[in-house]
Amino acid sequence: MYILFFLIIIFLILFKLNWYYTNFEYYGLIIKNSHIPDFTRWILSDKFIAKEYAKLNGFDVPKTYQLVKFPHQIKFNYKNFVLKPTDLCDSAGVYLIKDNKNTLTNKVVDKQKIIQELQNLRSSIKTEYYMHEYMYNGLIPFSGYIVEELLLDENNNIPCDLKCYVFGGKLHYIAKTYNRRIINGEQKFDSIWLDRNWEPIKTKMIKKGYVYQEIKKPINYQKIVMLVENMGKILRRHCRIDIYVINDKIYLGEFTFFCGARIHTFICNYKLGKIWLDNPDDYHYEDKRLKKLVPNFYNIPN
């Protein structure tokens, strides 16, 4: 009898945990919602389309130098540039080149080595690099590469990025990410999270690299809030809007609908999940301007 009672308790606990991680916890909601067909999230996961759409909505964006299908088509004739796949996330295949050196490794650009690395990455892609392929039977807008302007701050350094978590058209959290570096082949970074009033969050929000501190608010912070919240209202979906602030200009980094929430702490994903459930997405709405931005060589779902 005691064994049966114990097994029932274990079953109920596991059932509740499974429900929580599937229907409430932030990362579970990301996975669950990634299977819902939605052209808006699907097409804006493409870095080129995201830039073009951001321009329509008041953001500055880096200049695009090239948009190509294959790595061997990339021209390495720029001193400073960013090279990245149009479709991948999680920093996969991203190269920040400054003065002909990779800023993360501090090594001189080796064209053939980069081409080979991109080809190897493309042949070993798994779901950690994107989730939007779940929506339309594995279809991706464009599996190519974009070469664009390298943004530098007033000190000629790579700027910190601000990851703005927007739900229901309202900014709830900002994660400032900085001090990116490579240690033993693994990318590391530091981060501090802030609320909408730019107050730092004492509770640890990511598992590694969380640094609680008071930081200076950007001079144009109210403009930042207005811009990202307006974007959230237009999207009518939860989105992490990544931006850079340089000389009072607000540049879009990317729209992130499927972020790497596995690096978040339990309490962080609990908070984000609750906010999301309180502010549900509207997957029926689509901005008619989006399809007009798509080049004719891109894929479009039927």
Each predicted region: which residue ranges?
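Short catalytic/ligand-binding loop motif for oxyanion handling, primarily in non-cytosolic enzymes
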Residues: K51, H72-I74, C89-V94, T103-N106, ...
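A conserved helix-loop-beta module that forms one wall/lid of the active-site cleft
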Residues: Y27-N100, L104-K107, K111-Y134
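Aromatic-acidic/polar surface patches that form glycan- and anion
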Residues: F39-K47, C160, K217-I224
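Phosphate-binding site of ATP-dependent enzymes
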Residues: V109-M205
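C-terminal active-site "lid" helix and adjoining low-complexity regulatory extension at the edge
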Residues: W19-F24, V245-N302
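Terminal signal-anchor or tail-anchor transmembrane helices
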Residues: M1-L17
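A long amphipathic alpha-helix within ATP-dependent nucleotide-binding catalytic cores
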Residues: M135-E149, Q187-I250
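Generic beta-strand structural signal
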Residues: F76, V166-F167, V245
